[in-house]
């Protein structure tokens, strides 16, 4: 049974994983807590605490073995298998998601793409042929897709979420600004670039205020 993690720790571990995987792609064999902290904006002390919490330790003066760290975090997060994804929405955003080369490297495969626009159905986005939304339930069952991504106009989001729930999808990533209503047992993660931008601008404003403050 996988260890139950607090949401905050899970979020930080995914950041460490992403950074370490990128460093491996750049040819690195080891990574320090300071580097992980610098790239994620997390205090290095917190980094060490988090990794100690999952039973992973580094070597003084060397840091953490990158490959071992990736395997440890992937194991804790349950990412050692491949997950098929059903993506609804073949517009600009959906096409960009389907064409991503990063997702497969992280164990996520856009297996099916759906839309209700006749002009989009049948064309290829990424490596996937767009299907009609009416095929969602059947395709999800055949491909064992447990993750759904909503990249539609906001007006269609709730209806799509309902279809995903009916298809037994249990994790939904919502790229719209609609607050979705789903039954217990279904998890919705809202991807909100605006919130991230406001979060970033807050720290930018704080830094500018500190720079403008007179010295004492």
UniProtKB/Swiss-Prot annotation:
Keywords, in A-Z order: Cytoplasm, DNA-binding, NAD, Repressor, Transcription, Transcription regulation
Gene3D superfamilies attached to this UniProt entry: NAD(P)-binding Rossmann-like Domain (3.40.50.720), Winged helix-like DNA-binding domain superfamily/Winged helix DNA-binding domain (1.10.10.10)
SUPFAM superfamilies: NAD(P)-binding Rossmann-fold domains, Winged helix' DNA-binding domain
Residues where NAD(+) binds: 89-94
Example GO biological process: response to redox state
Primary localization class, coarse: cytoplasm
DNA-binding region: 15-54
Gene Ontology cellular component list: cytoplasm
Compartmental location: Cytoplasm
A molecular-function term among this protein's GO annotations: DNA binding
Function according to Swiss-Prot or TrEMBL: Modulates transcription in response to changes in cellular NADH/NAD(+) redox state.
Oligomer and partners: Homodimer.
Similarity remark: Belongs to the transcriptional regulatory Rex family.
HAMAP family: Rex (MF_01131)
Classification via NCBIfam families: PRK05472.2-3, PRK05472.2-4, PRK05472.2-5
Protein name: Redox-sensing transcriptional repressor Rex
Organism: Rubrobacter xylanophilus (strain DSM 9941 / JCM 11954 / NBRC 16129 / PRD-1)
Lineage: Bacteria, Bacillati, Actinomycetota, Rubrobacteria, Rubrobacterales
